């Protein structure tokens, strides 16, 4: 029996890719709590300059990831997803190591851009699992996989803050590089993939990729949905701590309260994503998507009227439970509407839209709060999500009518 005939243990691959996504999510978020402090340590002084450079080094990673994702997705469809996971984990480990050695802000900015160019572990993990798991378990598997990155992103800032306090800022980058190298080793030794490389001549061009989709218009609407989900999430991030301070008044533990309120949606998503993914496998991911979007609107609006931090925390927990269903539902619908031959590119295009949302969301939130106040951010975000719910419902209805 040739290696390509050996059956794949997709459950083991799911477990290993979950660990990989967890480590990647943790590695990315380990450095987030002190990013402005490291920028300052590299010689940037003055309030406005520090704000500008902190924003640049944060956003440039997502911008370059959005540009590079389609290229890596195409390469994954030609060479296989496992090799892309290995490339991403090792590339990010090397870049993180170099970040700890940066001597000035320009070196650090270039390395942050390289991090975006070489990233892509999580979308490739999604593509790998999507092409191996039975279709009737796609929602559960992708929902479960999504909790890996969320778990890492939740624990990362806490661990990063503690490590920075004990060892200083630069050593955290070296620790992060070690975490990513462990991710590389796990992928190398434990993930299995049967993949027949495709020559460049045999690869479908973009126009052929679109033509091969069961419903190109629906797939585009799913990309837009991913973008809007990230815009909605990111729009609240810049103002959350300031809004909590406005609600709490003069309290000594504002950082702890803000951190807790920032993390509760992730905890709720951890609990809800696999369960709602499994429910989506039974009743259809399109129903889960629309209901979760409507619930998100109904939870965002009262956030602009809360009077205490604990009211905000409760609403954000419920919002996290609904949000935990959104991206897995989108990914499951992408699986249903594409073939394994183009899965790498479809998931990479989706990642590009997600990265664009990661950049534009905080910009939108900051602009609205500067002009109209913190509470207006939640109302505008609710309006954006409502538009997305209507747009998604119309796209799904058109698909249903087309198949009847």
Curated annotation (Swiss-Prot):
It holds the Pfam family MFS_1. The gene is mdtG. It is a multi-pass membrane protein. This is Multidrug resistance protein MdtG. NCBIfam families: PRK09874.1. Belongs to the major facilitator superfamily. DHA1 family. MdtG (TC 2.A.1.2.20) subfamily. The chain crosses the membrane at residues 19-39, 56-76, 90-110, 113-133, 144-164, 171-191, 222-242, 254-274, 288-308, 317-337, 376-396. PANTHER family: MULTIDRUG RESISTANCE PROTEIN MDTG. Its main location: membrane.
């Amino acid at each position: 029996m040739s290696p390509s005939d050996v059956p794949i243990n997709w459950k083991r691959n799911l477990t290993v890719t979950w660990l990989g996504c967890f480590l990647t999510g943790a590695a990315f978020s380990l450095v987030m709590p002190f990013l402005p402090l490291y920028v300052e340590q590299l010689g940037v002084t003055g309030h406005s300059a520090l704000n500008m450079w902190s924003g640049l080094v944060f956003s440039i990673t997502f911008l370059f990831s959005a540009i590079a994702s389609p290229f890596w997705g195409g390469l994954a469809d030609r060479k296989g997803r496992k090799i892309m996971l290995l490339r991403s984990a090792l590339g990010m480990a090397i870049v993180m190591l170099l970040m700890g050695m940066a001597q000035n802000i320009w070196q650090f900015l270039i390395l942050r851009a390289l991090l975006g160019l070489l990233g892509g572990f999580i979308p490739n993990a999604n593509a790998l699992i999507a092409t191996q798991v039975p279709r009737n378990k796609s929602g559960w598997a992708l929902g479960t996989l999504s909790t890996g990155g969320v778990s890492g992103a939740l624990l990362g800032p806490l661990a990063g803050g503690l490590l920075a306090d004990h060892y200083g800022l630069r050593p955290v980058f070296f620790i992060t590089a070690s975490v990513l190298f462990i991710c590389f080793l796990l992928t190398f030794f434990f993930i299995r993939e049967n993949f027949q490389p495709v020559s460049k001549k045999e690869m479908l061009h973009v126009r052929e990729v679109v033509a091969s989709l069961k419903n190109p218009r629906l797939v585009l609407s799913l990309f837009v949905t991913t973008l809007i989900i990230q815009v909605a999430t990111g729009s609240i991030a810049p103002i959350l701590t300031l809004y909590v301070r406005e609600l709490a008044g003069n309290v000594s533990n504002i950082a702890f309260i803000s951190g807790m309120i920032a993390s509760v949606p992730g905890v709720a998503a951890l609990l809800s994503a696999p369960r709602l993914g499994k429910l989506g496998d039974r009743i259809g991911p399109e129903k889960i998507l629309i209901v979760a979007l409507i619930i998100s609107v109904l939870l965002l609006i009262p956030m602009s009227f809360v009077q205490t931090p604990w009211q905000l925390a409760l609403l954000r927990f419920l919002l996290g439970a609904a949000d935990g269903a959104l991206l897995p539902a989108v990914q499951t619908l992408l699986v249903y509407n594409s073939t394994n031959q183009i899965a790498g590119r479809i998931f990479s295009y989706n990642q590009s839209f997600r990265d664009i949302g990661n950049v534009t969301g905080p910009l939108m939130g900051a602009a609205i709060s500067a002009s109209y106040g913190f509470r207006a951010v939640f109302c505008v975000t609710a309006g954006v999500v409502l538009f997305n719910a209507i747009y998604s419902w119309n796209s799904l209805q058109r698909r249903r009518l087309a198949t009847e």
